[in-house]
Amino acid sequence: MKLMVKIALLTCGAEWSGVYHEIEKAAQKVGGELIFPEVDLSYIDEVEDRLGFKVGSANLKLMFARAMSIIEGNTDAEAVFIATCFRCAEGALVRNEVRKLIQQNTNLPVVMYSFTERTKASELLTRMEALTTIVERKSLLARKKQEGISLGIDSGSTTTKAVVMIDDEVAGTGWIYTKDVIESAKEAVNNALKEAGISLDQVETIGTTGYGRYTVGEYFKADLIQEELTVNSKGAAYLADKQEGEATVIDIGGMDNKAISLYDAIPDGFTMGGICAGASGRFFEITARRLGVSLQELGELAAKGDWRKIKMNSYCIVFGIQDLVTALAEGAKAEDVAAAAAHSVAEQVFEQQLQEVDVRDPVILVGGSSLLKGLVIAMEEVLGRKIIVPRYSQLIGAVGAALLSSGYRYKKMKA
């Protein structure tokens, strides 16, 4: 019988807002059991000064005391979930300080969340699954180098990517639009194998991730089938050579995007967009089509243009495109329109996603859209900081899957 992962819940307001039961439901669904570090009033008063600033909320004082109890080894917690209300600025400050203290003084994985009164278990599943994965595969996620010959497959909603790695180097890649999940994976894999100059029989380990990971994993008899949050984080940190310390990953995909805060290449904060495609790669595809250029050409145009010359009244993919078309009809230059599209995406990611995570340097931009030069410039301007775009930035999921799956090599060799 599989043992439940013990997750210490540090929260303020989850009980009275009705969110606690949703957190509990999400934890149970992925094999987690919530526990509460026990502290008494005298202990709360004793440790309060260690926070470094005065806290008004009694619930936040309790949350901090429970965190200190974890640090002092008074619980059998295997992971920590920190959650505070999105309306509370004091809560956000304490949440981040608690996160830092736990990471600096323990080896426990931490995931943070800012909840609303309407938060449902379905919204928490990805975070809870990542948390239990980190506990159950801790030694695997500590892997910093790929060994042998491994294949990683990222079966996404828009594109399917495959990467062959040989002795810590990317040897072959495959990238195609997703149609049929299995057929798309087979084609991407064949392209990667061909470029690497090997056959599937020579591959020692296989890892899958992405929306179609279970279907593709079953077909290829994968050694590793893992959710994309931990896999993408590992792939991005590995490619950027930032596997130690803090970092932020911004992943702009075909239909959605993610902002992930990392500590030692493991995610501890995460938000996903997807309600509006106006901040995704799809927006760039439509803009490029309107301008009659390729995506790469769109990126080059955007790098030369001035977004300030184009008036955009909406981030929406429909109305945003209408604004760009109107500007073209009025004689606007193509490069200015391209720059406006890039700036629109950068602003939307900043305003709607990066407000929900702790943005830490270095910032790593990945996903297919990271290859657009104009978007990189726009992101640096909006964020006011330097952006890292590693080689193979569009293939982080497949690279992460190949890297992590190689951890099963010795186990298979001994079998």
Curated annotation (Swiss-Prot):
GO molecular function: 4 iron, 4 sulfur cluster binding; metal ion binding
Residues that hold [4Fe-4S] cluster according to the record: 276, 316
Cofactor binding summary note: Binds 1 [4Fe-4S] cluster per dimer.
Keyword Membrane carried by entry: no
Cofactor annotation: [4Fe-4S] cluster
InterPro entries attached to this UniProt entry: ATPase_BadF, ATPase_NBD, CoA_E_activase_dom, Dehydratase_Activator_Redct, Methan_mark_15
Iron-sulfur found in the keyword field: yes
Database matches in SUPFAM superfamilies: Actin-like ATPase domain
Keywords on record: 4Fe-4S, Iron, Iron-sulfur, Metal-binding
PANTHER family: BIFUNCTIONAL PROTEIN [INCLUDES 2-HYDROXYACYL-COA DEHYDRATASE (N-TER) AND ITS ACTIVATOR DOMAIN (C_TERM), BIFUNCTIONAL PROTEIN [INCLUDES 2-HYDROXYACYL-COA DEHYDRATASE (N-TER) AND ITS ACTIVATOR DOMAIN (C_TERM)-RELATED
Quaternary structure note: Homodimer.
Record's protein name: Uncharacterized protein MJ0800
